[in-house]
Amino acid sequence: MLPHIPRATGFHTYASVGRELADLHVNYERVEPYPSVQEEASLHAPADPWERYRIGERKMRFPKLGRRDKDFTRLEYNDYVTLTGIPAEAQGYSISGRSPLEWIIDRYHVKTDKASGIVNDPNDFLREQGRPDAVVDLIKRLVTVSMRTQELLVTLPPFETYD
């Protein structure tokens, strides 16, 4: 005998929003880049795009506003490129305690595994793609995913069940 599974009030709304979220998250590389996110290049940025967008050993970071606070509307990609116009609300959506941008910050930098000596260099991936700005483009798209996810979650009715 199967256990009793209560039905959710507003099930069709949950199903519809769930489909939209699944499509959004599975196809995150195809969503439009968030329109307000812009690139600012420093005055000494190289003309060569491979050098301008090069990812180094230093992690990307949100600039500090003081001792503890960070400016989540800006992301220092490297010494030459800063992304601006990121809605602070994009930090409101998190996966395992981190926003998608925080996952990018943590994963996309050159690092060497201490045990094996293997170098993980995201620039190799960029060269394979033939797009030096692929990570910048990904960041813009992840802002769209974060913002749209939050918009969809707000539309869900309170979770209630009935028999």
Task: Give the location of each predicted region.
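Sequence-level detector for compositionally biased, low-complexity segments
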Residues: 1-163
